[in-house]
A protein has these predicted regions:
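Conserved residues in the N-terminal Rossmann fold of short-chain dehydrogenase/reductase
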Residues: 37, 61-62, 102
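Conserved Rossmann-fold cofactor-binding substructure of NAD(P)-dependent oxidoreductases
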Residues: 59-80
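Conserved glycine-rich Rossmann-like NAD(P)H-binding loop of the short-chain dehydrogenase/reductase
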Residues: 28-45
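Adenine-nucleotide cofactor-binding loop residues
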Residues: 41, 66, 88
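Conserved S-adenosyl-L-methionine
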Residues: 23-32, 119
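N-terminal Rossmann NAD(P)H-binding glycine-rich loop of SDR-like oxidoreductase domains
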Residues: 5-26
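Short, conserved SAM-binding/catalytic segment
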Residues: 46-55
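Conserved Rossmann-fold NAD(P)-dependent oxidoreductase catalytic core, especially the SDR/UDP-sugar
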Residues: 80-83, 87-147, 151-153
Length: 154
């Protein structure tokens, strides 16, 4: 599925992103594996962990899912997008509601818009159990994010 494909991972430097990248590199031969993240320190650490000498497919793209133009640029020529970017710490979300809303909801909307604009074949968006019956802002934003992706699929 991922052999000889261009894959972009939003939030690629996070816990899921790191494990996903490692799995892809061990099981497939992607043409390009692009890490899209706003954390340049973690990108630098990943570049050391997944050295370009050994993994020629690795690319790093500093950006934020809240920035539609940057996201659209990053998705040019991409076949698959794995959307893992999120503000996910429940307590942080409660004290920074607009950051959570802008990242989790606005970011999801931007991923859909950019993917459609760039003719991406498939987008896989991560969710959480907290979206099934939300009792906090994080869960509510992830439920809304899920609805955005479902709606875009119709």
């Amino acid at each position: 599925m991922f052999n000889n494909k261009n894959i972009l991972v939003t939030g690629g430097t996070g816990s899921f992103g790191n494990l996903f990248v490692e799995t892809i590199l061990n099981k497939f031969k992607p043409k390009k594996l692009i890490i899209f993240s706003r954390d340049e320190l973690k990108q630098s650490q990943m570049a050391q962990k997944f050295s370009s000498d050994k993994y020629k497919c690795m690319r790093y793209f500093v950006g934020d899912v809240r920035d539609l133009d940057r996201l659209t640029l990053a998705m040019q020529g991409v076949d698959y997008v794995i959307h893992a970017a999120a503000l996910k710490q429940v307590n942080i979300a409660e004290y920074n509601p607009m950051e959570c809303i802008n990242t989790n909801i606005g970011g999801a909307e931007n991923v859909v818009k950019a993917a459609l604009s760039a003719n991406v074949l498939k987008v896989i968006a991560l969710s959480t159990d907290k979206a099934s019956d939300p009792i906090n802002l994080y869960g509510a934003t992830k439920l809304t994010s899920d609805k955005i992706f479902i709606s875009a699929n119709n």
